[in-house]
Amino acid sequence: MGAANIFTIGMGVAQYNAQGKIGKYNQGVNNRNAKVLENQAIQLEQKAEFDIAQFNKSFKKIEGSTKVATAKSGAVVDSGSAYYVALSNAYEAELQKKLIEYNAKIAADNKREEATFAIIKGQIARNQASLAQLQTIATTGSSLLTMNKGSKIA
């Protein structure tokens, strides 16, 4: 086996190994990105819980102030217009909480979808590296055959 053959084989092996490492690295990067995105989804859900708690706190203050103002005016708190205002406020509060939950769920679902795509992108990178490795094997083999055309390979 001549020096050219040894060089060709050596370079083919080096290229094959490098392609494998690049594929694994790219897959690892995308898997890490997926974990970051998944954690962001969890944070969005936790933020929604916090936002609802803060909203409830603010709503209770406003509700209390409204009851005090109504009582000071001499109106009966649990009847008539005051009752309907309180009922309307309670309805709006529930609507606002549902809106906070909905928006957080949509944002978290979007992050999870991005995470899924990152994993898929990593798998594609790994598959592309494997295909490149196969191409390297084929090219190296073809080069060796071309170089040794007409001579006996021992």
Regions found by a protein language model. Name each.
Residues A4-I153:
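Glycine-/small-residue-biased sites that favor an extended, beta-strand-like backbone
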